[in-house]
Amino acid sequence: MSRTAIVFREEVLLHDTGPYHPESSARLEAILEAFERHKIDPPVLEIEPATREDLLRVHTAQHIDTIERTCRENLEYPDPDTVMGEASWEASLLAAGGAISACKAVLEGKYDSVFEIMRPPGHHAEPNRAMGFCLFNNIAVAARWLVDVVGLKRVAIFDFDVHHGNGTQKAFYDDERVYYASIHQYPHFPGTGFPEERGKNNTNLNIQMMPGVPKELWHSAIESLILPEFKRYKPEFLLISAGFDAHRYDPLGRQNLEEEDFAKMTNAVKGIAGGKVVSVLEGGYNLESLAESSVAHYLALDNEI
């Protein structure tokens, strides 16, 4: 039996971003179809939606109220790229709560790792701001639950999305209980994530990749910069912001990674916290490369490649 579960709920497909938006339900449908095509039948975790208390550990009350009101009353979006409608409120609570439920399952020993295949994504959402397709910061909500509720002292977040996770950095920049490490394209949206930004007691790390660099640079940066930092930090739990938009065919990035590179990155970091890993889907907008990269990532988590 697989030791790696997934998180998925059909309700998140109802988060309607319109016919031309890159972050659509077709992304998740493509991933699940690829799992079926590869004859992968992972266990699906039962989850609970995030509570207001869960969200308040990361987000301001004003932000939470604004998102709820915008969704329920169909108001003008706070950010033009970040579309939301009536079903978006439930989807966002399930995406954030699913990350917490995944962490619970790993801590309880039910699974070694969990891959959350949900939407909307989260790493651009700041404590008081929705942006970049993200309403709430799913991985930050999970990390704050791990340190505030469970009482872990050191949680690591590895973000390999082609875009810098400005929201995650902002949430934990002054909190040494969470080490945020991002490798991302620069210059690129959202224009953040600089190497000199090291956070409290050097628990923030940004590695910038110029557009079009050889994919080998990604792997050497992980081996020579991120892994030594994580080993020094000795995390008790690893969270991964799994964005697949650094793939060579992704329309929102200009990098050269392929499916096997996401598996290689996953294998490089997955053991850093004794094998306790929860991965949360972020970006990836070419449906075929997103789907195949997600399969490779899952198989690496499950020790199959």
Residue ranges of each PLM-predicted region?
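Charged, often glycine-rich, active-site loop that binds/positions anionic groups
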Residues: 48-72
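A general "terminal functional-core" signal
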Residues: 2-6, 13, 37, 65-305
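N-terminal low-complexity, Ser/Thr- and acidic-residue-enriched intrinsically disordered segments
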Residues: 1-57
